């Protein structure tokens, strides 16, 4: 019995150590909320644009539409400090992202979506991509991560499902892709203007002679932090 218990302890400690080695701590199910039921878009509302969003095969599937500006499928609930995890797969030619603590201009339902956005993009044909870095969508600031800290990387696997982990705590936003830490940003200004808000799944606008392209999300879950 002692040998069995010792073996179980070793395996458990090994799993935790491996998670830490990849830049993430082992997560616990307590406190987590699934934001997508796998069948419907209940709890989500589209803002801006005319891209299409459907619940399909256990995913939220977004498809571009010619002539449409950026489109966002937004959570009906707002969040302040939280940890968000999801899996995403995107066409190599499409840029996407997830809005964090976002708002609409003037608080109007049809106002322009704005706020910090975690970038989603493939690395195909490049020396690396900028997925995981934080952009100031419609804030007038462009990238919130300084140029000298926005190093292209290949943590994103083109054409495959990629796991994102995002932690927003006060003015600090941290992101991981497939267990690799990508971004550790502290931005007091964006936190002052956007201390809480909705999440948004972006389908980026495309040129008239391009597409259609698609992006899909699944296993979307969130834990509010205190």
Language-model features, listed with the residues they occupy:
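Sec-dependent N-terminal signal peptides
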Residues: 4-13
């Amino acid at each position: 019995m002692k040998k069995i218990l010792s073996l179980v302890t070793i395996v458990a400690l090994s799993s935790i150590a491996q998670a830490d080695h990849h830049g993430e701590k082992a997560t616990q199910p307590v406190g987590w909320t699934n934001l997508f039921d796998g069948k419907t878009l209940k709890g989500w509302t589209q803002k801006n644009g005319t891209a299409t969003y459907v619940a399909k095969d256990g995913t939220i599937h977004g498809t571009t539409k010619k002539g449409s500006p950026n489109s966002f499928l937004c959570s009906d609930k707002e969040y302040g400090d939280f940890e968000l995890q999801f899996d995403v797969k995107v066409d190599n030619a499409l840029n996407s992202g997830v809005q964090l603590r976002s708002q609409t201009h003037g608080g109007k339902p049809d106002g322009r979506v704005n706020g910090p956005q975690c970038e989603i993009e493939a690395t195909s044909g490049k020396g690396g991509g900028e997925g995981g870095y934080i952009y100031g969508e419609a804030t007038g600031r462009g990238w919130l991560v300084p140029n000298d800290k926005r190093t292209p990387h290949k943590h994103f696997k083109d054409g495959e499902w990629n796991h994102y982990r995002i932690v927003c705590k006060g003015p600090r936003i941290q992101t991981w892709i497939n267990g690799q830490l990508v971004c550790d940003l502290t931005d007091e200004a964006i936190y002052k203007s956007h201390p809480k808000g909705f999440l948004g799944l972006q389908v980026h606008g495309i040129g008239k002679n391009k597409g259609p392209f698609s992006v899909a999300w699944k296993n979307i879950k969130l834990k509010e932090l205190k």
